[in-house]
C-alpha cells in the first residue's frame, strides 16, 4: 500500500510502498478515504529534519544526556552511528483521517466492516491507504457527513478541547490569538457556543476569513490592545485562546494585556511560555495549557488498551470530543469546506509537503490528501534489489525477523550481517519499520504479519524481537514448523506459556535459542576460566543500577512486558547459572519498599538464589540510583579469589594478594558471539549453546521471584524438561 513517510535526518517526504498493517488486538483496520495535513505539526517536523545535527540537538536538548551516556559505554563512534541510524529512519506522519472499516479485531464489537469512521492519533491515523487504529480513537460518522469533512475530526477536537478549558459562557467576549486552521475552527466553536469572538493574526486574509466565519472583529497584534479594549466595552476579554504557533513570547504577553481582571487564558498552540508574572498576578489570570484532543491523550490504557473513561466522571474524552465536533459539522454549525485550500492525491503528497514547508509563496490553510478507495493494495512488499533465492539449503542461514525495533536494529541485525547470513523476510506490525529496516539490510520480503515470516521457506532461523507478550506464542508456532528459533528474552511470561514452549521445543526438529547474551561476553568467559578448576561453591554479588521505568511503559504492563523481573532479571540469573554451572534451586526476594506515585516497589529488589552445587547469588536490582553510576557490577568469590566485572567493559582479578586489571576497548555484553554461535547451530548442526533445561531454569526462577515477593517466603525452582540437563561444575 502507499504511505507518506518522512525522513527525520533530511526532512524529506516520500510516498513509499509498505506492507498493509495487521489487525492487532483492540484495533480496527480502516481503508482511508481522506486525511488532513496538520500544517503546524507536520511543518515543524520538516523544519527539524532540515537542520544539521547540532541544530537538532538544540531543538531536542533532552536527548544530549542520553547520547553522552552511550558515548561513555559504547564509545563515540558507535554512539554517533546510533544517532545517525535513528535519524535516518522513516516516520509515519499524519494523525487525522477518515475512511471505511474493512476488518476488526475479534475483541472489537462496537465496529464492523463497512462502518464509516473518523480516526485519530499519531502512528495510527497516518497518511496511508490502510491504517490500523485503536478502538477508542475511532468514531462512527453521522450519516450525511463526507469523508473530507470527517478528516477534520482530530484537528477539530484540538480546537474543541481548548474551548472547553476556557469554559466560555453564553455572551462572553473571547479572543482567539492565531487564526490558522485550529484558530479558524476555534472561532466557529465559540460562535456556536453563543460567544462574541475577536480574532488576532499577522495575516489580514486570515482575519477576513475569521470575520466571514463568525468573528465580530479582528486585527493584527500591533493594534490589538486598543481595538479589543473598545470591542469589549472597556472590560477586556473574558477569555483568550492562543492557537498561534511561534517560539516567541508575544502571544502569551498579549493575552495578559487584553484580559480582564480574573480572566482565563488557554494555550493550545506551541508558543513561548515565559509568563509575564506582573500582569498575570495583578489581574489574577488563570492560565491553562490544553492537552491535544482531550482526556485520554498519551494514556496507553485509553489509547492502546481500549479502556474508556466512565462518561459520568469524564464526560469529554478525546474520542467523545471528536464525536461532538463531527456532530457540529453535520448540523452545519461548523464550516470546514471554506477552510480547504488544497487537495492532493496520496501519490502527490510530497507536493503538499513542499507547500506547507514554505518553499513556495503560495498561501494555504487546510490541505487534504485523497485516496482511491477501490484500488488494489498488496499486503507484502518485495525488495526489487534482492534476487529471489531457492528454498533454504544445508549450510546456509536464512533469517526471518519478526519485530524491527531498536534492539533488533542496533544489536541483532549488525551481528547477524557480520556472520554472513541471508536476510529473507521481515515483519513489523505497522509495516513502516519492516520496509525501512528491510531495505537497509537487504531483506527479500517486507510484511506486517508474523505468520508470513514463519512460513517463508527460505528462512530457517526465525528471530523473534517483538514485545515480550508475544514471544512464547510465536516461538511455539515457529518450532512447530520445524524452524530454528532465536527469541529475545524473556522466553515466556508465565508457567503456562513456558510449558507450551518446552513441549514445542522437545517435539521440534528445530533448536531453541534465547537472547541471554551476557554469558557470551569475553569477561564472563574470563571469569569462568578463573574458577574452572574449583571444588567449592561460588558466591556472586550482582548489583544492577537499573534506573526508573514509568508505570505506563509497555514493559511494566503484565500482558505486554511482564514487568522488569521477568523481562530483565532473567539476564542476571542466566549469567549466574553459567558461572556456577548449576541450576537455581530456590529463590527468596524482598522489595526495597512500597512504591509511591510513579515508582513500582518491585523495580527495586534484593534477590537471594541458591544453586544445585551449593553456590549462592545475590542480585541487587535497584531502580532509584543515579544514571552516572555504571549499570552492572559483579563480584565473584571462590577459593581465595575474587573476580570483579565492571559493566562488561573492564575487570579485576584479586588472587595471591595481587590485583590484575584488564579492559576491553568498548563494552561487550556478548551479542556478537551469541549470534555467531546461533548461526553455527543452524549452519553446522552444532548443539544449542544454552541447553533447554538451562533456559527453563532461568525462566522459572523469575516466576518464583515474583511468587516470593507476593508471599514473603522462599520458593523452590522446579525444572520439568527431561530433554537436557544443566552441566555440573566438575564437567567445566
Model-derived features: positions:
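Predominantly a Rossmann-like dinucleotide-binding segment in NAD(P)-dependent oxidoreductases
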Residues: 285, 295-313, 329, 511, ...
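Glycine-rich beta-strand-centered segment in the early N-terminal region that forms part
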Residues: 21-37, 45-122, 683
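Rossmann-fold NAD(P)-binding glycine/threonine-rich loop
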Residues: 268-286, 290, 296, 491-511
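Mid-domain Rossmann-like dinucleotide-binding core that forms the NAD(H)/NADP(H) cofactor-binding site
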Residues: 116, 123, 148-223
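N-terminal Rossmann-like dinucleotide-binding module
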Residues: 378-441, 461
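C-terminal helix-rich "cap/oligomerization" subdomain common to oxidoreductases
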Residues: 354-365, 369-370, 375-392, 461, ...
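Beta-strand-loop-alpha-helix segment that lines the small-molecule cofactor/substrate pocket
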Residues: 260-261, 472-516
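Contiguous beta-strand/loop segments that form the cofactor/metal-binding neighborhood of enzyme cores
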Residues: 351-354, 359-373, 377-381, 567, ...
Amino acid at each position: 500500500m502507499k504511505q507518506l513517510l518522512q525522513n527525520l535526518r533530511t526532512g524529506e517526504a516520500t510516498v513509499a510502498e509498505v506492507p498493509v498493517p495487521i489487525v492487532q488486538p483492540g484495533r480496527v483496520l480502516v481503508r482511508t478515504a481522506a486525511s488532513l495535513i496538520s500544517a503546524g505539526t507536520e511543518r515543524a517536523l520538516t523544519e527539524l529534519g532540515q537542520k544539521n545535527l547540532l541544530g537538532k540537538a538544540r531543538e531536542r536538548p533532552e536527548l544530549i544526556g542520553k547520547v553522552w551516556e552511550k558515548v561513555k559505554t559504547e564509545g563515540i563512534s558507535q554512539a554517533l552511528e546510533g544517532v545517525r541510524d535513528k535519524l535516518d529512519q522513516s516516520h509515519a506522519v499524519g494523525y487525522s483521517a477518515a475512511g471505511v472499516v474493512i476488518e476488526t479485531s475479534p475483541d472489537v464489537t462496537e465496529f464492523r466492516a463497512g462502518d464509516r469512521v473518523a480516526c485519530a492519533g499519531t502512528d495510527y491515523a497516518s497518511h496511508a491507504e490502510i491504517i490500523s487504529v485503536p478502538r477508542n480513537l475511532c468514531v462512527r460518522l453521522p450519516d450525511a457527513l463526507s469523508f473530507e469533512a470527517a478528516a477534520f475530526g482530530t484537528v477539530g477536537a484540538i480546537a474543541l478541547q481548548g474551548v472547553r478549558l476556557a469554559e466560555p459562557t453564553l455572551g462572553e467576549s473571547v479572543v482567539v490569538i492565531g487564526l490558522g486552521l485550529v484558530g479558524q475552527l476555534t472561532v466557529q466553536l465559540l460562535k456556536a457556543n453563543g460567544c462574541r469572538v475577536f480574532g488576532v493574526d499577522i495575516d489580514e486574509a486570515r482575519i477576513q476569513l475569521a470575520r466571514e466565519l463568525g468573528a465580530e472583529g479582528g486585527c493584527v497584534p500591533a493594534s490589538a490592545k486598543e481595538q479589543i479594549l473598545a470591542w469589549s466595552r472597556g472590560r477586556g476579554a473574558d477569555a483568550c485562546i492562543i492557537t498561534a504557533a511561534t517560539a516567541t513570547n508575544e502571544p502569551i504577553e498579549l493575552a495578559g494585556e487584553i484580559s480582564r481582571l480574573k480572566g482565563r487564558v488557554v494555550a493550545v498552540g506551541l508558543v513561548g511560555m515565559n509568563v509575564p508574572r506582573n500582569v498575570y498576578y495583578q489581574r489574577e489570570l488563570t492560565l491553562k495549557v490544553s492537552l491535544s484532543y482531550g482526556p485520554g491523550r498519551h494514556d496507553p490504557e485509553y489509547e492502546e488498551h481500549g479502556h474508556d473513561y466512565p462518561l459520568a466522571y469524564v464526560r469529554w474524552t478525546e474520542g467523545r470530543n471528536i464525536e461532538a465536533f463531527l456532530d457540529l459539522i453535520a448540523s452545519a454549525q461548523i464550516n470546514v469546506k471554506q477552510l480547504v485550500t488544497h487537495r492532493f492525491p496520496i501519490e502527490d503528497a510530497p507536493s503538499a509537503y513542499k507547500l506547507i514547508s514554505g518553499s513556495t509563496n503560495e498561501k494555504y490553510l487546510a490541505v487534504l490528501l485523497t485516496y482511491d478507495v477501490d484500488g488494489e493494495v498488496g499486503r507484502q512488499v518485495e525488495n526489487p534489489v534482492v534476487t529471489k533465492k531457492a528454498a533454504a539449503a544445508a549450510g546456509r542461514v536464512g533469517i526471518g525477523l519478526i519485530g524491527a525495533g531498536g534492539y533488533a536494529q542496533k544489536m541483532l541485525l549488525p551481528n547477524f550481517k557480520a556472520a554472513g547470513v541471508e536476510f529473507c523476510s521481515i515483519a513489523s506490525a505497522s509495516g513502516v519499520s519492516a520496509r525501512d529496516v528491510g531495505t537497509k539490510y537487504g531483506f527479500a520480503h517486507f510484511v506486517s504479519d508474523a505468520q508470513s515470516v514463519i512460513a517463508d521457506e527460505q528462512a530457517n532461523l526465525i528471530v523473534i524481537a517483538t514485545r515480550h507478550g508475544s514471544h512464547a506464542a510465536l516461538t511455539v508456532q515457529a518450532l512447530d514448523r520445524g524452524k530454528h528459533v532465536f527469541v529475545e528474552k524473556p522466553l515466556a511470561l508465565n508457567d503456562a506459556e513456558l510449558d507450551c514452549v518446552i513441549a514445542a521445543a522437545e517435539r521440534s526438529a528445530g533448536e531453541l535459542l534465547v537472547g541471554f547474551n551476557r554469558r557470551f561476553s569475553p569477561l564472563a568467559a574470563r571469569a569462568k576460566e578463573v574458577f574452572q578448576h574449583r571444588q567449592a561453591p561460588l558466591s556472586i554479588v550482582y548489583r544492577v543500577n537499573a534506573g526508573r521505568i514509568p508505570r505506563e511503559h509497555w514493559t511494566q504492563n503484565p500482558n505486554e512486558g511482564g514487568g522488569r523481573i521477568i523481562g530483565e532479571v532473567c539476564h542476571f540469573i542466566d549469567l549466574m547459572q553459567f558461572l556456577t554451572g548449576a541450576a537455581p534451586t530456590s529463590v527468596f526476594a524482598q522489595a526495597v519498599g512500597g512504591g509511591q506515585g510513579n515508582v513500582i516497589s518491585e523495580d527495586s529488589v534484593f534477590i537471594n538464589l541458591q544453586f544445585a552445587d551449593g553456590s549462592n547469588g545475590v542480585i541487587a536490582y535497584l531502580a532509584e540510583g543515579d544514571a552516572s553510576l555504571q549499570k552492572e557490577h559483579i563480584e565473584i568469590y571462590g577459593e581465595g579469589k575474587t573476580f570483579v566485572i565492571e559493566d562488561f567493559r573492564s575487570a579485576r582479578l584479586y588472587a595471591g594478594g595481587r590485583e590484575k586489571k584488564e579492559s576491553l576497548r568498548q563494552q561487550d555484553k556478548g551479542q556478537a558471539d551469541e549470534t555467531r554461535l546461533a548461526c553455527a547451530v543452524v549452519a553446522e548442526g552444532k548443539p544449542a549453546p544454552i541447553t533447554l533445561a538451562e533456559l527453563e531454569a532461568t525462566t522459572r526462577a523469575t516466576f518464583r521471584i515474583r511468587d516470593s515477593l507476593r508471599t514473603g517466603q522462599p520458593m523452590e525452582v522446579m525444572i520439568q524438561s527431561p530433554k537436557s540437563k544443566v552441566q555440573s561444575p566438575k564437567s567445566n
